């Protein structure tokens, strides 16, 4: 991580420590580490300006870039409250016009960072982001299915693997996952309402899990086989191994037929 410390020396040591932890311990990809870096650097530059008395209307990209936070100490970080984070999210929405998905990613980064300082570094007694909510995202449905068709498809699920299949279809309908991304989901990729998926080129991305997804995952995990060959895999086949792409394809086609759609 030495290269990262040098490359990221314009952020406080606590952010550098976090980047080290996420890279060396959590094994996050280089692109994900850079996203954490940019998200946190921007957030703390904004927070410094906010606490210096600047109004949102006066904070622009040029001012953000000029703001030095490299020597920011733990006392400043301890002074951050939930209200400050709410103001930051409002700035992202109203001034920068960030999309809900972008704001959701930045919330996930902030929550991970403050959780690290609270439970790993143990330099914070109170986590200001513990009650920070993820922006509500619109439900994402495949373009070729209407809402009624989607509901009909979900209602067609039954059988021995009902909870598993319902969870798979719910994630497909709400999260816009590729087939390869879905079958490669591991148990540890799910953190509360955030799902980390590995896409093309081993690129990681974070996806917000709405209530329907969270309920489906919880219901499936409650009945998921425990004595399996691949313990990390979320979706398990009847042989106790990670579910395969072909199995999912056949399953989806079956329920489309049951729901009286054309496959």
Residue spans of the language-model regions?
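Conserved catalytic core of the tyrosine transesterase superfamily
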Residues: 1-263
């Amino acid at each position: 991580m030495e290269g990262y410390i040098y490359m990221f020396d314009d952020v406080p040591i606590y952010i550098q420590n976090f980047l080290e932890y996420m890279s060396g311990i959590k094994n996050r990809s280089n692109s994900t580490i850079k996203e954490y870096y940019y998200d946190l650097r921007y957030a703390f530059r904004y927070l410094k300006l906010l606490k210096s008395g600047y109004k949102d209307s006066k904070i622009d990209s040029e001012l953000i870039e000029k703001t030095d936070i490299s020597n920011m100490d733990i006392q400043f970080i301890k002074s951050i409250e939930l209200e400050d984070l709410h103001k930051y999210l409002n700035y992202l929405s109203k001034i920068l016009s960030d999309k809900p998905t972008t704001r959701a990613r930045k919330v996930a980064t902030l929550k991970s960072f403050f959780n690290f300082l609270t439970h790993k570094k143990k330099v914070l007694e109170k986590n200001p982001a513990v009650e920070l909510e993820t922006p509500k995202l619109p439900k994402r449905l495949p373009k070729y299915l209407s809402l009624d068709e989607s509901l009909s498809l979900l209602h067609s699920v039954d059988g021995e693997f009902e909870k598993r299949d319902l969870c798979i279809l719910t994630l497909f309908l709400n999260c816009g996952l590729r087939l390869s991304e879905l079958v490669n989901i591991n148990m540890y990729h799910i953190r509360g309402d955030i799902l980390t998926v590995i896409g093309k080129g081993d690129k990681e991305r974070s996806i917000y899990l709405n209530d329907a997804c969270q309920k489906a995952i919880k219901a499936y995990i409650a009945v998921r086989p425990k004595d399996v060959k691949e313990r990390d895999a979320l979706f398990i086949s009847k042989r106790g191994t990670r579910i395969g792409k072909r199995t999912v394809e056949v399953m989806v086609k079956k329920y489309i037929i049951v729901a009286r759609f054309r496959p």
